Design a protein with these regions (language model features):
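Core AdoMet radical
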Residues: 1, 8-24, 34-55, 63-86, ...
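Short, flexible, glycine/charge-rich loop motifs used to bind or transfer phosphoryl groups or to couple energy/partner
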Residues: 3-4, 62-63, 161-163
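Generic structural signal for well-ordered alpha-helices
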Residues: 3-4, 28-32, 57-60, 86-91, ...
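Radical SAM enzyme [4Fe-4S]-AdoMet core and its adjacent flexible, acidic
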Residues: 67, 71-181
């Protein structure tokens, strides 16, 4: 197909859907197909982990998926799940041999919940904190320090630099309707 000829020089695909994609079997079938490609070093997706891990990993495996290439970016939403449930989903993925990292938006009112999440996540699962775009104010010094204790890389979120397209030659972006652009 067309994707195989487009993707050869790139080495990795990350699916960042609008909404939760991994509840749909066809995403797992597609990730499995991509993971079988010799030119692919990694395939992954962003998810809120609201799917049945055992069932979906079975679909991935039945479609020839190579789990050593699978990556999961798990996004924690405290209004949608609990710290113990989210951490257990991460633990299941890690136990299955899947690389996973967690991310959450740096909402100041959620600081205590995010501290608990950091403490509860299994070893091998880092927690990234993203700057809250809708905060409409600067983080206080205390908030910055609190988020930095959770995620030492949070400082990069505070001083966002413009993308440098010349650093990303030949990258593809797939629109929601399936169109690909460079």
């Amino acid at each position: 197909g067309h994707l195989e000829t487009q993707v050869e020089p790139y080495g990795a695909v990350m699916v960042v859907p609008y909404g939760e994609a991994l509840i749909h079997d066809y995403y797992w079938e597609g990730l499995a197909r991509l993971s079988r490609m010799g030119t692919m070093e990694a395939v992954g997706a962003q998810t809120n982990l609201s799917f049945d891990i055992e069932r979906q990993l079975t679909i991935f495996k039945e479609n020839g998926g190579r789990k050593e290439k699978l990556r999961v970016w798990a996004t924690f939403h405290p209004e949608m799940t609990t710290v113990p449930l989210f951490a257990e989903q991460c633990r299941k993925l890690l136990s299955a041999g899947i690389r996973v990292c967690a991310g959450a938006v740096g909402v100041p009112e959620n600081l205590e919940t995010l501290r608990r999440l950091k403490e509860t996540l299994p070893g091998g699962c880092c927690l990234w904190i993203n700057r809250m775009d809708g905060l409409n104010r600067r983080y206080t010094e205390e908030e910055q320090q609190a988020f930095l204790r959770i995620d030492p890389w949070f400082y990069r979120e505070l001083h966002v630099k413009k993308a440098m397209p010349e650093q990303c030659p030949g990258r593809l972006f797939v629109e929601s309707d399936g169109r690909m652009r460079r």
